[in-house]
From Swiss-Prot:
Keywords: Amino-acid biosynthesis, Cytoplasm, Histidine biosynthesis, Lyase. Pathway: Amino-acid biosynthesis; L-histidine biosynthesis; L-histidine from 5-phospho-alpha-D-ribose 1-diphosphate: step 5/9. The active site is at D11, D130. The gene is hisF. This is Imidazole glycerol phosphate synthase subunit HisF. It comes from Blochmanniella pennsylvanica (strain BPEN). Its main location: cytoplasm. Belongs to the HisA/HisF family.
């Protein structure tokens, strides 16, 4: 069994780390390099950088700060933001990223997943899915362009169907961004995660809702996710990664200790 992963998430806007609640009302929380370095030294297993303003503005993530990050940290990191072509993906990997993640561009052109997987290998290709629970219809729906609340919209895809489809196209890993829980610190949506896990044969990363050590434990133990991604609790130093890993280890979760 592979060790479970603790993954700080850094949302980037205008070259600063920002954070909102339910993908809205973003505020600046710090410098990209400073936070990346802090998390790498504190025992994070990898980092994820989402340039959330790139796709809505028809731009591509800034490769300059990717190169700078690669020079100051020694753990794997994944980058997302407006990656629409194989050429762009290659440039980002050449700048030092270990993986690339696509979200809205994959919804527009699903064949992009297959093209990236065929040329770069599935291990490099992550598909990030912004999933929203519609309480009226009682279904989970996929949203796109969520980095800009004025452009965000619900797609025709239900979340489980999209999870199945991206695997067919060659996604090597799936990050499930649970929008209803994002920034709320009330725990991950375990029901949704358990259901997705039944149909997900690639590594599954939970994102959205972490507020306590127990929430991480529940995601690993009860939903069998491969990694737990969080932002607010790390940015605001509510949870210390080293102590979190010690807790998980004592609870029987296989984890890489700092």
């Amino acid at each position: 069994m592979l060790a479970k992963r603790i993954i700080p998430c850094l949302d980037v806007g205008n070259n600063k780390v920002i954070k909102g609640i339910q993908f809205k009302d973003h505020k600046i929380v710090g410098d990209i390099l400073e936070l990346a370095n802090r998390y790498a030294k504190s025992g994070a297993d990898e980092l994820v950088f989402y340039d959330i303003t790139a796709s809505p503005n028809d731009q591509v993530v800034n490769k300059r700060w990717i190169s700078q990050i690669a020079k100051v940290i020694n753990i794997p990191f994944c980058v997302a933001g407006g990656i629409n072509t194989l050429k762009q993906a290659k440039q980002i990997l050449a700048s030092g990223a270990d993986k690339i993640s696509i979200n809205s561009p994959a919804l527009i052109n699903p064949m992009l997943i297959q093209e990236l997987a065929d040329h770069l290998g599935t291990q490099c290709v992550v598909v990030s899915i912004d999933t929203w629970h519609n309480p009226q219809k009682k279904i989970y729906q996929v949203k796109c362009y969520t980095g800009d609340s004025t452009r965000a919209k619900i797609t025709t895809w239900q979340t489980l169907d999209w999870v199945k489809k991206v695997q067919e196209y060659g996604a090597g890993e799936i990050v499930l961004n649970m929008m209803n829980q994002d920034g709320m610190k009330n725990g991950y949506d375990l029901d949704q995660l358990r259901n997705i896990r039944k149909h997900c044969q690639v590594p599954l990363i939970a994102s959205g809702g972490a507020g306590t050590y127990q929430h991480f434990l529940e995601a690993f133990r009860d939903a069998d996710v491969d990694g737990a991604l969080a932002a607010s609790v790390f940015h605001n130093q509510i949870i210390d990664i080293h102590k979190l890993k010690q807790f998980l280890n004592k609870e029987g979760i296989k984890i890489r200790l700092c």
